[in-house]
Amino acid sequence: MAAALLARAGGSLGRALRARDWRRLHTVYQSVELPETHQMLRQTCRDFAEKELVPIAAQLDKEHLFPTSQVKKMGELGLLAMDVPEELSGAGLDYLAYSIALEEISRGCASTGVIMSVNNSLYLGPILKFGSSQQKQQWITPFTNGDKIGCFALSEPGNGSDAGAASTTAREEGDSWVLNGTKAWITNSWEASATVVFASTDRSRQNKGISAFLVPMPTPGLTLGKKEDKLGIRASSTANLIFEDCRIPKENLLGEPGMGFKIAMQTLDMGRIGIASQALGIAQASLDCAVKYAENRHAFGAPLTKLQNIQFKLADMALALESARLLTWRAAMLKDNKKPFTKESAMAKLAASEAATAISHQAIQILGGMGYVTEMPAERYYRDARITEIYEGTSEIQRLVIAGHLLRSYRS
């Protein structure tokens, strides 16, 4: 599957990536300069986004349209299964490459970015790490080429940040598990062909009694709730999953009974790198929009960029963006080196999401009235940015994660 992406990027990229030369980069502080292979990948994804996403992003947002054709093309390029090994039909790349690609896709369309992020990080990620060989063949390979996508069902109407308080239950009956309960805010839900679901199998053990399951969609006993009418990322669907005596085979248990909370937390660590990358794309698009407008808009006889106040705004925007990008790359590199990265992924997600919100806000300020109308994309960037501070752990949760790791390091 990676062949199309590598061919699009050029022969030298293909040869280098196949030889895994890019793995030599991954000494975390070795360099902040991307190797040539990753630079070529970035350009390939930027070209795709400029051609396939930018021209239709406003329409997708306005009409709440899922980008079916574009997602299929992304699958053919390997963008929906970037760190999945080639023997499972994935692209076989690393998480740094994934972060770079996701930023560029999100720069073109944030909704398409989150569709890509959920399939890579939240759906394929836990199956790749915890699934059996048979599960990987059944639940990963068909989801790599864009024909099918998956979703991730953890949050519930009564608990979002408190992931260990699952009220959805799963009980054993013969050769089956029977699921009951409701999952909320599930991205990709209306288009998904499968989901990773977390349910309590032993309530007396609290979070140690949570297990993870693989559920095909559609399936008897599983109903989709209404599509939520959202502030932003409108081209991606969000809905509840309602389980009413939903029966699945016993072999659809992911990992061991009681491993669900561990699986969820480790998956969110990966997912936060994805959301940080999505936020970077929104932030970069906002900065691009602001600079382009300020260069061409004249006031007091000169372009806005000649005004010191505008220059200060642009400098602060660039500083926040570059700082968050380096944090995100560091988290990705740590993961690629099989080092702990929970704190670093939380830092990246927090910094990038807050940067995206702040930068998109300042972009509207620079555009003035033009920033408030749909004729310009700045207002869409602002709406899209806001969710990055909420899903896959709010900013408040990220601060708790960071502080917890920080304090433990001082006590050890």
From Swiss-Prot:
Belongs to the acyl-CoA dehydrogenase family. Its cofactor is FAD. This is Short-chain specific acyl-CoA dehydrogenase, mitochondrial. It comes from the Eukaryota. Short-chain specific acyl-CoA dehydrogenase is one of the acyl-CoA dehydrogenases that catalyze the first step of mitochondrial fatty acid beta-oxidation, an aerobic process breaking down fatty acids into acetyl-CoA and allowing the production of energy from fats. FAD binds at residues 152-161, 185-187, 297, 365-369, 394-396. Its main location: mitochondrion. The modification Phosphothreonine is found at T27. It catalyses: a short-chain 2,3-saturated fatty acyl-CoA + oxidized [electron-transfer flavoprotein] + H(+) = a short-chain (2E)-enoyl-CoA + reduced [electron-transfer flavoprotein]; butanoyl-CoA + oxidized [electron-transfer flavoprotein] + H(+) = (2E)-butenoyl-CoA + reduced [electron-transfer flavoprotein]; pentanoyl-CoA + oxidized [electron-transfer flavoprotein] + H(+) = (2E)-pentenoyl-CoA + reduced [electron-transfer flavoprotein]; hexanoyl-CoA + oxidized [electron-transfer flavoprotein] + H(+) = (2E)-hexenoyl-CoA + reduced [electron-transfer flavoprotein]. The active site is at E392 (proton acceptor). The modification N6-acetyllysine is found at K51, K72, K129, K208, K262, K292, K306. Residues 1-24 form a transit peptide.
